[in-house]
Amino acid sequence: MAIYTSGTQSDNSEPVGNDPKFYTRPSLGLKLWGPLVPSSDNTTGLWSLVAIQTGLGLFLMQRFRKLGKKWVKRDIADFPSLNRFSTTHGDMYMTRHIPVQFGGTHSFNIRVGTRTGFWYSERFRTIRRVTYLLAGTLILSQSMLEVSRLTLLKYDPWVEEAKSVREKQFFNDIVKYYHEGVDSTKFKAKDELSGQSISLNLPEVKQSIAVARAQAQAENLVTKWFGPLDYKPQSFSEFLDKLEYYLNMTDFLNNLRRQKKNDKINSQLVKLEEENKRNRQRIHTLMAHAPARAIRTNQEVQDIYAIRKVLLHHDTESPNDIPLTEIWAIYNPWTNLALDTALSIKFFPSVIFNEDYYEHQKRLKDSEHVTSIENSEDERKP
């Protein structure tokens, strides 16, 4: 365990002449903030500045809207000079500089304080409105540009560079602090269990102190916001070149992946066609060498009803595994017989009415008469 104690600065110490140069962090829509732009991998800082900038743009647009002509909506009944002998109600619009207090003819004696000069003229107000409009539009467009960069880009070269530089700086600080050694006037090491002092020249102690110092440097507020202060970000042209290279490589890999899939599908289709060709040849050979009457003709096949088959599950190993109740409910033979049987039923009436009945009685009488005549002729014969 290392304990840091502040040391005294020597009066003879000279300022360092080679101070690292600070470079403005890159961005697409935060140029307004200049050197305050955070590192590209600091998403919290970027979104904070975008929110503040958007609020500023909305404020300017609100100022542009408020500097326009103000119209006041009043009821006609509030104007005695216009509505003296009537109770008619209606709306009347007027500018705000007209006095809104009306109490009779004495209201026309109210003087309105007016200011003169260029700063209070209509021309200067127009200039202010145009300025607010242009500034608000520019700021909002810049905010939208930065939001598009933060949300739409899947690969951001500035972000990848900032992450890489931050990680390199952390490990470089560890190596630097390790080789610098430990000043006994600033650090003391004690054993965590026994509490006794430990020599600062041990490699384990030097390594632990170097990691602690590098971690403290990385967690510094300035380092968190800007990243390593001495690194120079890549220019906008390099940013576009790397982004274009990434997009080209992405398209190339996607096309290569699709080409592999298409080649695989084409090879499978070729194999399927060859297999179908072999199957057709085998079927043709079997048909050619089959004995007579071994293969039924189409007419014979049509006369044979298809037998309903029961398909069991592939896990069925014994008769006990067969669900007889379910199979009987699905493949009921009586239901199958009803589906396969076609019946034609005709109903004949057993009772005849009206004309048909009388005609039937007449036919019966005629037949009885003919029968009696035939019997009498038979009796007369010897």
From Swiss-Prot:
<feature type="topological domain" description="Mitochondrial intermembrane">
    <location>
        <begin position="147"/>
        <end position="382"/>
    </location>
</feature>
<keyword id="KW-0999">Mitochondrion inner membrane</keyword>
<feature type="topological domain" description="Mitochondrial matrix">
    <location>
        <begin position="62"/>
        <end position="129"/>
    </location>
</feature>
<keyword id="KW-0496">Mitochondrion</keyword>
<comment type="similarity">
    <text>Belongs to the MGR1 family.</text>
</comment>
<feature type="topological domain" description="Mitochondrial intermembrane">
    <location>
        <begin position="1"/>
        <end position="44"/>
    </location>
</feature>
<keyword id="KW-0812">Transmembrane</keyword>
<comment type="subunit">
    <text>Component of the mitochondrial inner membrane i-AAA protease complex.</text>
</comment>
<dbReference type="Pfam" id="PF08602">
    <property type="entry name" value="Mgr1"/>
</dbReference>
<feature type="transmembrane region" description="Helical">
    <location>
        <begin position="45"/>
        <end position="61"/>
    </location>
</feature>
<protein>
    <recommendedName>
        <fullName>Mitochondrial inner membrane i-AAA protease complex subunit MGR1</fullName>
    </recommendedName>
</protein>
<keyword id="KW-1133">Transmembrane helix</keyword>
<keyword id="KW-0472">Membrane</keyword>
<dbReference type="GO" id="GO:0005743">
    <property type="term" value="C:mitochondrial inner membrane"/>
</dbReference>
<comment type="function">
    <text>Component of the mitochondrial inner membrane i-AAA protease complex required for mitochondrial inner membrane protein turnover.</text>
</comment>
<feature type="transmembrane region" description="Helical">
    <location>
        <begin position="130"/>
        <end position="146"/>
    </location>
</feature>
<dbReference type="InterPro" id="IPR013911">
    <property type="entry name" value="i-AAA_Mgr1"/>
</dbReference>
